[in-house]
Amino acid sequence: MAAPSLLNWRRVSSFTGPVPRARHGHRAVAIRELMIIFGGGNEGIADELHVYNTATNQWFLPAVRGDIPPGCAAHGFVCDGTRILVFGGMVEYGRYSNELYELQASRWLWKKVKPHPPPSGLPPCPRLGHSFSLYGNKCYLFGGLANESEDSNNNVPRYLNDFYELELQHGSGVVGWSIPVTKGVVPSPRESHTAVIYCKKDSGSPKMYVFGGMCGARLDDLWQLDLETMSWSKPETKGTVPLPRSLHTASVIGNKMYIFGGWVPHKGENTETSPHDCEWRCTSSFSYLNLDTTEWTTLVSDSQEDKKNSRPRPRAGHCAVAIGTRLYFWSGRDGYKKALNSQVCCKDLWYLDTEKPPAPSQVQLIKATTNSFHVKWDEVSTVEGYLLQLSTDLPYQAASSDSSAAPNMQGVRMDPHRQGSNNIVPNSINDTINSTKTEQPATKETSMKNKPDFKALTDSNAILYPSLASNASNHNSHVVDMLRKNEGPHTSANVGVLSSCLDVRTVIPETSVSSTVSSTQTMVTQQTIKTESSSTNGAVVKDETSLTTFSTKSEVDETYALPATKISRVETHATATPFSKETPSNPVATVKAGERQWCDVGIFKNNTALVSQFYLLPKGKQSISKVGNADVPDYSLLKKQDLVPGTGYRFRVAAINGCGIGPFSKISEFKTCIPGFPGAPSAVRISKNVEGIHLSWEPPTSPSGNILEYSAYLAIRTAQIQDNPSQLVFMRIYCGLKTSCIVTAGQLANAHIDYTSRPAIVFRISAKNEKGYGPATQVRWLQGNNKKAPLN
């Protein structure tokens, strides 16, 4: 966690959808990037379910159905996968509940469940302000406040310290309650406390930690329950213990329990406040307990003023939820202030990053042109942007810091991907190969701008910082379109390059270029693999990436892409120098042995970038980015350098959040293109027939001459794949001028089922002109969970 002075709170000021009314006594859980809020209230108790998508800044009200529970406050609320359990709470003043409801969030279906009572003893009585914690297939209920009076208007409070265990059924439903026999001194009765469960990674049993609460006075004690031995203990702690409190929140991220807000004792006298304020007040103090060392650390003290409104104001009865390493806080009660007959509640939503983000995946190539790359990487959750850098072995002219440039603003959101390497085998054992190096083929690529059906972010969020992304809309393109013809397995497509030789045995992966096409029935993966091609028998292909995309609305960006020569792998310790398009007249910038110069491409809001330029390093600098924090150089003061055709570049990317710039990804290598070879076949279709399947395609949109023939290949099972599943072996199943072929059931019986993403049979189709073979369209025919019979 950052030092107290470096905490970087963020208030979410831009969002869409129906915002829930401000409230207190509500609860929240997280399912992936969703924050789900239920209950609480101010002017009456709320009974609706609200969802906030932290990735799109969007509130929405799901259409729930089934046994919808009544509104409640100060209830138990836990999440097990995609199901949520609600227990107890106040349903109206003086009337509490002990009913249990289950919500299947995948269908927004409520169900009232009736667990069996304990073998000995009574089930939990109606209560509020209890803790309800999940670990494994069990929920643990502790404490709360009950009403001893049967008359809800005559409230007789009774504080509880009973302990129950609720066993869950897998997926849906519950088994029943039990009352574990515990050892040691039991914590005193209390309500509005917090309880979290934590288990050390290396060793140790899971432990439940209870902190604070209320039993006539606020508490600051910490209790530990070993869930294996059922032994209570009071661990000794170091550091400054937070003030006694209730109605606070406790959230676990890593090995830390973060405590925020709540009611605390009022320090000092203020004659302008009410008698209540002199006794208790809300706080915005923020601390964490290291659960491995039981040491408290204060991040924001109770006495720390906030004149700039740079963090959440004091509150109690709010909700807090951890999504990744980010904490979200919403609403809550603002002390004893009142508006008419209601409490004043906070309406704001805040978040705080607790750690720097992890390294993203390697940069992946979507498409390449003679002077640009369209690249992507896997999204990292809860980040604010990405720093993309490149490096090259070619020398370039060192830049002086007084040159200026006006960077463009660009950014596109893409979907997850997979990557692998591949081999191609001849039709028979007697086939041989002679590998030779020749000219580079040119490939033609297509990219897609995915447009989700919902508005993900406001327009102002398209790009976080200036970048060197460039528009490639002035180029031509091809599209790979997979359509499922019947109710058989789904299909997906990749674009890849095969050699000009028909009897190819070995293929070493190089680079890939991807594009996507929407369909309500198919998942499409497209990948272009660069080859060294010749008229003789042989090819060397180096496959870097593939891109998997789910159904979205798409537009086509048209560009030429280039299959590049094989790029020599250079380890991260290799020496590199920057380059220039023209012979430099100034001295070339040098790099110390064992170091590589990295130049910023820009900082991007989303996980894709169009790269046609980068920023030159000032003389004597190894990097222009301040990796230690989120501050970046003023790119307007730096000179830009265009990418050069036929040149290899290395890329790396790092994610940025409120704690700064995280570690960089592993290095990827790509090469700009050289024009001339045919594009990849497009509009691939697969349909079943009596012989097997019918495979058809459309000619390349840019043949760059006459198409002489097509070749189709099938990935087959071999012992080599069993040893290295990521390295596919292909057998040619068709060669000719027709744009279709039959794949027999006998051939399919030998097909390899690729499990790199979803199970699929893999085909490749490529076209040949006078220069040789261009990129191949790689087709993944999705098989569901069927491992053996693709035609069943």
Curated annotation (Swiss-Prot):
PROSITE patterns named among the record's database cross-references: FN3
Kelch repeat segments: 34-79, 83-130, 207-255, 257-303
Pfam families given in the database record: Kelch_HCF
CDD domains, alphabetized: FN3
Organism of origin: Homo sapiens
Gene Ontology annotations for the cellular component aspect, listed alphabetically: cytoplasm; cytosol; histone methyltransferase complex; MLL1 complex; MLL1/2 complex; nucleoplasm; nucleus; plasma membrane
Tissue spec: Highly expressed in testis. Detected at lower levels in spleen, thymus, prostate, ovary, small intestine and colon.
Gene Ontology molecular function terms on file: transcription coactivator activity
Keywords: Cytoplasm, Isopeptide bond, Kelch repeat, Nucleus, Repeat, Ubl conjugation
Keyword presence, Thylakoid: no
Glycyl lysine isopeptide (Lys-Gly) (interchain with G-Cter in SUMO2) crosslink site(s): K553
Biological process annotations from GO: antiviral innate immune response; chromatin remodeling; immune response involved in response to exogenous dsRNA; negative regulation of transcription by RNA polymerase II; regulation of DNA-templated transcription; regulation of toll-like receptor 3 signaling pathway; regulation of transcription by RNA polymerase II; viral process
Compositionally biased residues, Polar residues: 419-445
Subunit structure: Binds KMT2A/MLL1. Component of the MLL1/MLL complex, at least composed of KMT2A/MLL1, ASH2L, RBBP5, DPY30, WDR5, MEN1, HCFC1 and HCFC2. Interacts with TASOR.
SMART domains to which the protein is assigned, alphabetical: FN3
Keyword Transit peptide: no
Protein name, as recorded: Host cell factor 2
Annotated compartments: Cytoplasm; Nucleus
Domain Fibronectin type-III: 359-449, 583-675, 677-787
Region annotation (Disordered) ranges: 399-447
